[in-house]
UniProtKB/Swiss-Prot annotation:
Catalytic activity, reaction form: 1-(5-phospho-beta-D-ribosyl)-5'-AMP + H2O = 1-(5-phospho-beta-D-ribosyl)-5-[(5-phospho-beta-D-ribosylamino)methylideneamino]imidazole-4-carboxamide
InterPro entries: PRA-CH (IPR026660), PRib_AMP_CycHydrolase_dom (IPR002496), PRib_AMP_CycHydrolase_sf (IPR038019)
Enzyme Commission numbers on file: 3.5.4.19
Record carries keyword Cell inner membrane: no
Keywords assigned by UniProt, alphabetized: Amino-acid biosynthesis, Cytoplasm, Histidine biosynthesis, Hydrolase, Magnesium, Metal-binding, Zinc
Cofactor, free-text remark: Binds 1 Mg(2+) ion per subunit.
Source taxonomy: Bacteria, Bacillati, Actinomycetota, Actinomycetes, Bifidobacteriales
Record-listed Zn(2+) binding positions: 90, 106, 113
Localisation: Cytoplasm
Record's protein name: Phosphoribosyl-AMP cyclohydrolase
SUPFAM superfamilies per the UniProt record, alphabetical: HisI-like
Family of this protein: Belongs to the PRA-CH family.
Gene: hisI
Domain of life per record: Bacteria
HAMAP family from the UniProt entry: HisI (MF_01021)
């Protein structure tokens, strides 16, 4: 869908809203991914209004759970996220937003919020011989 479908709206399109499965605070998790490299940059939360703003402005808006307010990524840091695509998962309880990220995505100054936390020890799984070649 293009932005023209949402111009001059003050509420989220009901056709989109009905597909969402919100948590008990009215939020949906949003995975933010760099559009060209597919690097996962961060996870934020959106309510219907943050989703509407994101769909209509071309910039990512989140709902801050700690500050209880809307924040548009990059307004204070300059590290803006320009929307390239917006998709719901099959259950409607998660969003994937592909963006063109300017600078760091993480509040720590790192490109990705997953750099700071680091890798955890994990047993690496392997496909069986029968599964090789399957997607």
């Amino acid at each position: 869908m293009t932005n023209e479908a949402y111009d001059n709206t003050t509420t989220l399109d009901p056709r989109i809203a009905q597909r969402l499965k919100h948590d008990d605070k009215g939020l949906v998790a949003a995975v933010i991914q760099q559009f060209d490299t597919k690097e996962v940059l961060m996870v934020g939360y959106m309510n219907d209004e943050a989703i509407r703003r994101t769909l209509t402005t071309g910039r990512v808006t989140f709902w801050s759970r700690s500050r209880q307010e809307y924040w548009r990524k990059g307004d204070t840091s300059g590290h803006a996220q320009y929307v390239k695509s917006f998709a719901l998962d099959c259950d409607g309880d998660a969003i994937l937003v592909e963006v063109d990220q300017v600078g760091a995505a993480c509040h720590t100054g790192k490109r990705s919020c997953f750099e700071e936390g680091g890798q955890l020890p994990v047993v690496v799984g392997h496909r069986t011989k029968e599964q090789e070649g399957q997607r």
